[in-house]
């Protein structure tokens, strides 16, 4: 259960810091596990690397922000830690399949990537008596 707690804590930390420049080492320090083991365990359980998860969540949230139409695309790019608008547009297009400017015209094209929730369900482990 210690691993599950660590993974949940890692997810919470990443979610709280989507608008901050964080690294896998920052996440590992937060949960007190070596970066190597955390990255390996996270990838095994979720199918994503730590930073792939962060990137996907940022790009999903960025699309939601663009739909609200309250901020300029360049400001959203910087908000989610992209160094240039071009790098943001490239990552956004790869993830969503459309450019940030096309989002309002075609909101159904946005790829959904909601926060991970880790739950464990253990079933079985008991014997059944034979009915006679």
Each language-model region and where it sits:
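N-terminal intrinsically disordered/low-complexity leader segments
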Residues: 1, 33, 43-46
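Short coil turns linking two alpha-helices in DNA-binding domains
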Residues: 34-35, 83-84
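Short hydrophobic/aromatic patch on the recognition helix
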Residues: 38, 42, 87-88, 92
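…primarily DNA-binding HTH/wHTH and HhH modules…
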Residues: 1-5, 90-132
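Core residues of bacterial helix-turn-helix
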Residues: 31, 80-81
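Terminal helix-turn-helix DNA-binding modules in bacterial transcription factors
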Residues: 8-25, 44-80, 107-126
């Amino acid at each position: 259960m210690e691993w599950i707690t660590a993974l949940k804590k890692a997810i919470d930390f990443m979610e709280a810091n989507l608008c901050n420049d964080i690294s896998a080492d920052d996440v590992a320090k937060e949960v007190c596990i070596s970066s190597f083991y955390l990255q390996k365990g996270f990838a095994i359980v979720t199918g994503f690397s730590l930073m792939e998860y962060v990137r996907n969540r940022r790009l999903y949230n960025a699309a939601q922000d663009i739909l609200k139409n309250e901020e300029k695309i360049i400001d959203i790019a910087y908000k989610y830690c992209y160094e240039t608008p071009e790098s943001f547009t490239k990552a956004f297009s790869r993830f969503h399949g459309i450019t940030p400017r096309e989002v309002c015209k075609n909101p159904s094209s946005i790829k959904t990537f909601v926060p991970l929730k880790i739950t464990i369900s253990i079933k079985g482990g008991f014997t059944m008596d034979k009915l006679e």
